[in-house]
Swiss-Prot record:
This is FMN-dependent NADH:quinone oxidoreductase 3. Homodimer. It comes from Pseudomonas fluorescens (strain Pf0-1). Its cofactor is FMN. Belongs to the azoreductase type 1 family. It catalyses: 2 a quinone + NADH + H(+) = 2 a 1,4-benzosemiquinone + NAD(+); N,N-dimethyl-1,4-phenylenediamine + anthranilate + 2 NAD(+) = 2-(4-dimethylaminophenyl)diazenylbenzoate + 2 NADH + 2 H(+).
Length: 203
């Protein structure tokens, strides 16, 4: 089994999403000792956003690309291959201004590729990544579940992965992390309990 672990928070060791995603990955490895983990830190090693260079590189043969275009082509190919070959993905997704971090959006733009992870048919778009499992580690300073704002970044990620054909999606959520120490501790404890008692209870 191949497990892809994605972090995207800019907070380093102070990040709740990083702490929880690490726990998910460790629990997964304990449940499946043969799992091979690929780790990508999108904050420390950011993926560049789409640009005209990215698009030109995709439509230019390798021998005709300049250095910048070749870099973009290799980055796209490596990022896509990591996703396609993964059996499961752990995505740490803190809420930044009601959506995902820009670093995570840049990664999504590299994996949502027509003809590779989805295709268009006469009946509409069809995801090509069925069979994968995704665990979204969702964190937020505020409390959004059940509120007018909703948990927008979770909904977005579910939409993206669903579009790619992935239906096995679990969410580990810790919110209200900026509401004081007691609320934060309770939220983290609840998320940790879900990881150990629900996601991997049978392990």
């Amino acid at each position: 089994m191949k497990l892809l672990h994605i972090d995207s928070s800019i907070l380093g060791d102070n990040s709740a999403s990083r702490q929880l995603s690490s726990q998910v990955t460790k629990a997964w490895q304990a449940a499946e000792p043969s799992a091979v983990v690929t780790y990508r830190d999108l904050a420390a090693d950011a993926i560049s956003h789409f640009s005209s260079t990215t698009l030109v590189a995709a439509g230019t043969t390798a021998e005709l690309r300049n250095a910048a275009q070749q870099h973009e082509a290799e980055l796209s190919a490596t990022t896509l291959a990591e996703f396609i070959t993964a059996d499961a993905i752990v995505v740490a997704a803190p809420m930044y201004n009601f959506t995902v971090p820009t670093q995570l959006k840049a990664w999504i733009d590299r994996i949502a590729v027509a003809g590779q992870t989805f295709r268009y048919t006469e009946a509409g778009p069809e995801g090509l990544c069925g069979g994968k499992k995704v665990v979204i580690v969702s964190t937020a300073g505020g409390i959004h579940a059940g509120q007018a704002s909703g948990v927008a970044h979770e909904d977005y990620l579910k939409l993206v992965f669903g579009f790619l054909g992935i239906t096995d999606i679990e969410v580990v959520r810790a919110e209200g992390l900026a509401y004081g120490e007691e609320v934060r501790n309770n939220a983290m404890s609840a998320a940790q309990a879900k990881i150990s008692e629900q996601l991997f209870a049978a392990a």
